Each structure stands twice: as C-alpha cells, then as structure tokens.
UniProtKB/Swiss-Prot annotation:
Residues annotated for ATP binding in this entry: 42-49
Subcellular location as annotated: Cell inner membrane
A GO term from the CC aspect: ATP-binding cassette (ABC) transporter complex, substrate-binding subunit-containing
Protein name from the UniProt record: Probable D,D-dipeptide transport ATP-binding protein DdpD
Taxonomic source organism: Escherichia coli (strain K12)
Function: Part of the ABC transporter complex DdpABCDF, which is probably involved in D,D-dipeptide transport. Probably responsible for energy coupling to the transport system.
Keyword Protein transport found: yes
Gene Ontology molecular function: ATP binding; ATP hydrolysis activity
Superkingdom, natural source: Bacteria
Cross-referenced InterPro entries: AAA+_ATPase, ABC_Ni/Peptide_Import, ABC_transporter-like_ATP-bd, ABC_transporter-like_CS, Oligopep_ABC_C, P-loop_NTPase
Amino acid sequence: MTQPVLDIQQLHLSFPGFNGDVHALNNVSLQINRGEIVGLVGESGSGKSVTAMLIMRLLPTGSYCVHRGQISLLGEDVLNAREKQLRQWRGARVAMIFQEPMTALNPTRRIGLQMMDVIRHHQPISRREARAKAIDLLEEMQIPDAVEVMSRYPFELSGGMRQRVMIALAFSCEPQLIIADEPTTALDVTVQLQVLRLLKHKARASGTAVLFISHDMAVVSQLCDSVYVMYAGSVIESGVTADVIHHPRHPYTIGLLQCAPEHGVPRQLLPAIPGTVPNLTHLPDGCAFRDRCYAAGAQCENVPALTACGDNNQRCACWYPQQEVISV
C-alpha cells in the first residue's frame, strides 16, 4: 500500500484558557495521498486553520497541548520534530498558501528577492538560476510581465496578483504537500475562479498533494477529489466530494449545504441551522451537534464514531445517518 503524504490519526489538541481548556481538536483523523486534492470544510471556529497550523508547526510553542494522536508527513513524525528539521521541511516538503497574501509577503522587499531567497534556501543553485526559476514560476501562474513583477513590491500588485505570487512561492521548491488556507476568500469571484484553476492545474501537473481549507462547498466541489467536514473540532463526515455534496449523511452537512443560495433564485429566504456552535471549553456530553439537530435521538447522548455510511468509503459520525439528496 502506498504511504500517504499526510496521515493524521486521532488528534486531540487544546489551548489553555482562563475558564478552562479550549478543546480545539477532538479525535481528528485525516489522510492525503500523492496528487490528491482534499477539502477541509467547516464554519469559523471548527478547527480547520488550527489543523493547518499544527501540520506546519506554526502555533506558538507552549500555547497548546497535544493530548494524544500523531501527524506523519511522508512517514516522519511532525509533532516531535526538532526546529532545525522543521525549517528544512517547510517549503521543501510542505508549503502553505495563506488567506491574505499581503500579510504573508514581506512588504519591504521586492517580489523577486523574496522568491529567490526561498528557492536558494532549499536548493543549491546560483542567484541567476534562482531568478530564472522564479520568472518561470510567475509565468506559469499567467502573470503578465513576470520580469517586471520581480522588481515590484507586494503593495504594487492587485490582490489576485499577490495570491498568484503566493501560489508560485508555494510550488517553488516542489513540496509534496501544499496547504491552502482559504486562499481565495478575499478575491473577486472571477479572479477566484482563475486562481483556483491555476492551483488545480499546477497541482495535477506536479503530482503535489493539496489540503484545501474552505467554508464554501461550491468552491470545494470545483476543486477537490474528497472532502472532510468539521464541526466543533471534530470530523463529522468524509468521502468523495460528489458523494458528500449530493448525498450527505450527517445532519450538519445537510444544513451547511442547504444554507447556500441557489443560482438564479432571486430574494430567497435562506434556511439557517438553529442554535449556536457549542462552547469548546465546555463541550456537551455525547454528540456536539445534538442540541441543534432535527434528527437527534436517545443514542446521541453517546459520542458517535466516524463509521462507514455510504458508497466509496463515505463515513459520518452520526447515530442516525440521513438519506438526503442535494442538488448543487
């Protein structure tokens, strides 16, 4: 069996707080294979970005506690890796595309210098070779006048251009995994589509695995091979993207999809999931979604496991899986 690029198993993480520990991740398991584009979906506070930052080991030291679980990157232990090893991995094995490129790029340095620094940090090549590679990467991202862009500062580029630069940077050292944390949220819809197409094309051409984090099921449906849905720090459904979107089993996934506006239907009243997300400091016993769930029953007083509930290895953490059919 082929070794997965990323393998997360039964991860539990909390942050200390004045009113008790905040249980940000609860028994999270996730796998990504070479060349696969996987979506991680959920509303704000569900644990998506915490998962991404932990994979990169970018959470401040001492600010969190991993109670149990493991993260393996190409078979190597991420959680116990030393800082020197992490510096070698970041960029070369795993890279990240952040939501807001203006805060990710250095505003005081020209684009070309930033790209060349990253390339030469991981590859023993000359400045001339690094410059040529940077220009090639920018041209692959369909950036016009790539040579001119090399001499510009981030603030001189549009949001879409900056995000293309970030994608080029992420691929610059040919990592096996790229984590894209809502990279198109701040972009116009037309620019968003262009950036997604570039990301997908480059990932397919290079065989790079991608973990794509989003709250938008429509975006995920265009890009991802499979999807994991998170709620209150837990994965509550996973499977092939088409199966999860058109045949969701978990009531939360169904609610998430029904909240999306339909194209061509003007002034519709959107349905909403009743109630609020539970306090992660004091999670309820049993299923975290049961107080908001229309299908809740007596079994929901116990925590459900993520088990098979459909075709193509679709799984959901629900005692009463649904048979909903959604048109998206």
